[in-house]
């Protein structure tokens, strides 16, 4: 059961007990082979999506968000208090997770205990859209406690300039170890019709740990800058070439965990056309540290293009080739990677929408030319909107590295906003042998692996909104 109560005209309390927090749409497949950093999956559950913009802190690069509610896997209850009083906007989120994943390699048995999440956030409005803010988070999980606190700000000295910064400190105790770490980031931006400039510096201690957040790594200090100049070939909206923008991106840093320096230089040209068209041509080169070694990274050439070709068709695509790293934990090596991606949105009428995306990645060992992997991921989504209430959606996804296909069929009827009924059916297929023997068992040559259904599911989900 869920409810919403307006305490005052500006303060609202949302609560839920034993909710069905299952998603009605599967996460999109991504290439997972040879990824150094974790993949980010956005929140799709309504309770956590509503009003969560408040909990974001100022313009981080390494930290995607300070409160990533996908960390709360299976909530027993949730409560959220949000509101505005004068110039102060605040929010408090509290939830108990029934099946959390353990952090700190303490063992799978800890995953059976509940984990309590508590987040407090407040911002104070200054002039225009400037603000100063603070955040406090606390998680408790079977003897392990993680605490984080800090502040952030955004100020705009002029219409073309902005300065943003944040500082966080964390402390983690699991009964045997007590660790503490800090993180800080400062960003300056300048943007006019002619020039665009960004400079950012950030630092993360090796022992920085914020359980509620999503960030890529810790234990590094780095700085980067992006500079772009815009040229407008001809005034007016009818000329096909709207803007030409040469740009350069440069980054330096030191990774204390991987024990090495890093640098990266990317430069190129960006063209903007009518019909939301754009074309990029870039080249980049850099060094990246991994397990005490420094490897070459970058792209000899990278191309990207996209356009709203006609009213009912939008497409995009890109490709690049260059040096890369095979991120093996024992024996990493230098390689070369060829990658490409493409997609389109087709909407021939007001009812039908077809989305398609594809990603392909190939990696070869540089010293021998040996092919290490060749991966393709395809995602297709077809939606038919019969009217403003009723839709049917079919989603199919394919991952060649995992040899699996996922299909989802969903029918959804929304009576009024907040009152909706879902019915869905999903299947997961994986390629393998159907004789029951291990995959590496010796078999006759004519026996081939086939895709077989590993999981099927049928679900019904309804929500009802009652206003008092």
Which residues fall in each region the model found?
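Outer-membrane beta-barrel channel domains
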Residues: 1-242, 251, 255, 283-288, ...
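Exposed, low-structure sequence patches enriched in small/polar residues
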Residues: 74, 168-173, 177-468
